[in-house]
């Protein structure tokens, strides 16, 4: 982990996640009745909970809108959920104004072109390992894990490590 990423992670007060390809593996499953389902990784969920327990706020901004994402956000206690929004930078502008935060205090984890404006603007903009090449090239860092396979956990732990809180977050389970 680079010192640059750790330095950027120190100021983070809000962590924002895309869903498809980040909290999931990016596959879309459509059933005969027209419904869809997604799979989420429990390691990622625990990482998000650890981050929130350490006082870092969390949000989801997704280009697609599905009930399953609302259910997952509620399950994890993520207070800020925006779905069906491709204009992610506009959404984040409004959220930052509401929370009284600056872009330098935001970390974002994404995987594809709609995420790129946010990745390039925030204090810590990261891409998952299997993100589009162009997105990985413009991110501050890239996770070792793929989307839906522990990338969000890695991202959360990076922030906690940068802020000197990872050991305490882990010790809470001893």
Stretches found by the model and what they are:
Residues 11-13, 56, 104-105:
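Short coil/turn segments at beta-strand junctions that form active-site/ligand-binding loops
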Residues 6, 13, 27-49, 129:
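Basic, amphipathic juxtamembrane/active-site segments
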Residues 1-17, 165-174:
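Non-catalytic pre-domain segments flanking phosphatase-related domains
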Residues 9-28, 119, 152:
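Asp-based phosphoryl-transfer active-site loop
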Residues 48-72, 82-83:
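Substrate-recognition element of Asp-dependent hydrolases with the DxDx(T/V) motif
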Residues 37-38, 74-76, 80-82, 89-174:
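Mg2+-dependent phosphoryl-transfer enzymes with acidic/Ser/Thr/Gly-rich catalytic loops
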Residues 24-30, 69-76:
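Short, basic/glycine-rich phosphate-binding loops at helix/coil junctions
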């Amino acid at each position: 982990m680079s010192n640059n990423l750790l330095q950027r992670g120190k100021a983070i007060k809000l962590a924002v996640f895309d869903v498809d390809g980040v909290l999931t593996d990016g596959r879309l499953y459509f059933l005969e009745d027209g419904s869809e389902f997604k799979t989420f990784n429990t390691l990622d969920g625990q990482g998000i909970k650890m981050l929130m327990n350490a006082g870092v706020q969390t949000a989801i901004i997704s280009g697609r809108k599905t009930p399953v994402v609302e259910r997952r956000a509620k399950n994890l206690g993520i207070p800020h959920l925006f779905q069906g929004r491709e204009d992610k930078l506009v959404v984040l502008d409004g959220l930052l104004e509401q929370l009284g935060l600056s872009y330098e205090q935001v970390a974002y984890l994404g995987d594809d072109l709609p995420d790129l404006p946010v990745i390039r603007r925030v204090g810590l903009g990261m891409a998952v390992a299997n993100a589009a090449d162009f997105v990985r090239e413009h991110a501050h860092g890239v996770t070792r894990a793929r989307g839906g396979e522990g990338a969000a956990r890695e991202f959360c732990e990076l922030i906690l490590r940068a802020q000197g809180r990872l050991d305490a977050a882990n010790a809470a389970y001893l």
